[in-house]
C-alpha cells in the first residue's frame, strides 16, 4: 500500500473552483436558480480565510451551501420583497456568525526575541510565532506552548549551539550562568511538534541576546544541528503557500530543500524571495534588522 501526499490548493485555485463549480452547484441545490445570489471575490476570500482552515475544499463547499440555504430562507420569509442579489461580507457574518478562524498575517512591527516560523498541519501550512524572553535565574530553559518532545529537543539544540558559539554572537561567557531563558509558542491549546522549528527558535534566541529585532517580513523553517548546520524539512509546498498568504516576503529555507522549489506554482514564487542556507551564520544578516 502506497500513501500519496497531495499538496493543498492555493487561495487562487480555491477561488477559481468556487466560482466555476461550487457556487453554481450550491445555488442550484438551494433552489435559487431564479434569484441567484452574487458572490464577490472579497466574500469568497472571507469564507476561505475566516470560516475554513483546510488544504482541500470540503469546508468551503459547506460554507457556501450554508450561505445559499440562509439566502433561500430569507427569500421565503419575505415574500414579495426584493432581496439584494449581492452577498456582502456583512451578510456572511449575519448568515454564518462571527468568524471561526483568525487569518494570520506577518507581524505589523519588528520585535526583539520574536521570530516567524512555518509549520505543517493537517489543514496545510501555517505561521507560528516563536517568542523568547530572558530573566535572572540559573541556566534554566523553560518551554511552553504544548510542545512535543522533538520540538523541545530542537529548542535545546538551538540554545546549546548559541552557548557554544557565544563569542561569535558577542555574548559574555558567563551570561548563561545567571539567566533563565523562556521559549513560548502561542496557541497553547494546540499541540506542536517536529524539527522544523529549530531554525526560527535559534533566530529568536539570537535576536533576544543581540537585541536586534527580527525583520517582520521574514519567515524561516529548518532543522538545526548542534554545529549550526541546517537540514531539510518536509511540507515546503504548503509552508510557502502559507507564507505568501500571510504577506511574508522573504523565506529562509535549508539549502537541501531547494529541490522542492520546482513544485511550487510560479504565481507563488514571484511573490517570495527564497533564501537557501546551509549554516545559521548565513541567515543572521538577512533575518535581523540593524
Language model regions located:
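Short, solvent-exposed beta-strand edge segments and adjacent coil->beta transition regions
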Residues: 1-3, 180
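Conserved beta-strand segments of alpha/beta enzyme cores
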Residues: 2, 35, 273-275
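Broad structural signal for hydrophobic residues in well-ordered alpha-helices, predominantly aliphatic
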Residues: 26, 92, 205-206
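Conserved catalytic-core segments of large NTP-driven translation/proteostasis enzymes
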Residues: 42-134, 138-144
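Peripheral, non-AAA+ core regions of ATP-driven protein-machinery
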Residues: 84, 102-105, 111, 115-116, ...
Amino acid at each position: 500500500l502506497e500513501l500519496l501526499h497531495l499538496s493543498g490548493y492555493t487561495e487562487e485555485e480555491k477561488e477559481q473552483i468556487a466560482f466555476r463549480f461550487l457556487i453554481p452547484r450550491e445555488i442550484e441545490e438551494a433552489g435559487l436558480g431564479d434569484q441567484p445570489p452574487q458572490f464577490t471575490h472579497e466574500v469568497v476570500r472571507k469564507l476561505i480565510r475566516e470560516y475554513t482552515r483546510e488544504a482541500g475544499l470540503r469546508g468551503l463547499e459547506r460554507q457556501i451551501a450554508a450561505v445559499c440555504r440562509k439566502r433561500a430562507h430569507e427569500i421565503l420569509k419575505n415574500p414579495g420583497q426584493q432581496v439584494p442579489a449581492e452577498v456582502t461580507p456583512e451578510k456572511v457574518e449575519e448568515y454564518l456568525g462571527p468568524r471561526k478562524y483568525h487569518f494570520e498575517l506577518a507581524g505589523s512591527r519588528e520585535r526583539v526575541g520574536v521570530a516567524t516560523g512555518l509549520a505543517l498541519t493537517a489543514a496545510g501550512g501555517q505561521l507560528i510565532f516563536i517568542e523568547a524572553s530572558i530573566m535572572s535565574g540559573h541556566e534554566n530553559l523553560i518551554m511552553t506552548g504544548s510542545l512535543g518532545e522533538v520540538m523541545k529537543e530542537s529548542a535545546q539544540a538551538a540554545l546549546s549551539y548559541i552557548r557554544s558559539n557565544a563569542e561569535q554572537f558577542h555574548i559574555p561567557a558567563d551570561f548563561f550562568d545567571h539567566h533563565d531563558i523562556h521559549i513560548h509558542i502561542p496557541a497553547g491549546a494546540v499541540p506542536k511538534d517536529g524539527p522544523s522549528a529549530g531554525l526560527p527558535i535559534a533566530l529568536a534566541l539570537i535576536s533576544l541576546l543581540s537585541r536586534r529585532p527580527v525583520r517582520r517580513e521574514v519567515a524561516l523553517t529548518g532543522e538545526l544541528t548542534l554545529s549550526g548546520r541546517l537540514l531539510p524539512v518536509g511540507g515546503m509546498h504548503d509552508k510557502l503557500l502559507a507564507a505568501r498568504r500571510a504577506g511574508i516576503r522573504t523565506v529562509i529555507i535549508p539549502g537541501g530543500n531547494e529541490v522542492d522549489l520546482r513544485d511550487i506554482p510560479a504565481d507563488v514564487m514571484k511573490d517570495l524571495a527564497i533564501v537557501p542556507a546551509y549554516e545559521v551564520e548565513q541567515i543572521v544578516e538577512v533575518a535581523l534588522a540593524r
